[in-house]
Curated annotation (Swiss-Prot):
NCBIfam families: PRK00124.1. Pfam families: DUF188. HAMAP family: UPF0178. InterPro entries: UPF0178. This is UPF0178 protein VV1_1847. Belongs to the UPF0178 family. It comes from Vibrio vulnificus (strain CMCP6).
């Protein structure tokens, strides 16, 4: 198992949680972004900078991900693609996307996109709460423990 992080929009506090988990477990972890993402110098923690552009980082993750890898992303279409390839997808808010839930999330995303394109103000996501941070860390720990066995 490897961890792939869609680091372009990943909150710093979540990146720090991922780094701590990778350090503790030794799982290989790669942060993929179109800008420099500072990561500690560890043999199992990497940063991959891709060219700027629409979905370039997402496409790189999809190209490299393998079954049973874990992708950290809040990008619903990316989560759908990696789940289709047999990987796990976890949002930075602690939601584990599954084959059963991702289609509904895509429908909601598409509906909100339609509303925004018609001029309706939908607002952005709320700030990351302590509960969501804890939920993320707990899900990450459970996934890593499952695959360490």
């Amino acid at each position: 198992m490897k961890i792939w992080v869609d680091a372009d929009a990943c909150p710093k506090v979540i990146r720090e949680t991922i780094v701590r988990a990778a350090e503790r477990t030794g799982v290989e972890c790669t942060f993929v972004a179109n800008h420099v993402v500072p990561v500690p110098r560890r043999p199992n923690i990497h940063s991959l900078q891709v060219p700027a552009g629409f979905d370039i980082a997402d496409n790189e993750i999809v190209k490299r991900v393998e079954p049973n890898d874990l992708v950290i992303t809040s990008d619903i279409p990316l989560a759908d693609e990696v789940i289709t390839k047999g990987a796990l997808a976890l949002s930075s808010r602690g939601e584990l996307y599954t084959k059963d839930t991702i289609k509904a999330r895509l429908n909601i995303r598409d509906f909100m996109e339609t509303m925004r394109s018609s001029g309706i103000q939908t607002g952005g996501p709320a700030a990351l709460s302590q509960t969501e941070r804890r939920e993320f860390a707990n899900h990450l720990d459970r996934i890593l423990a499952k695959f360490k066995k």
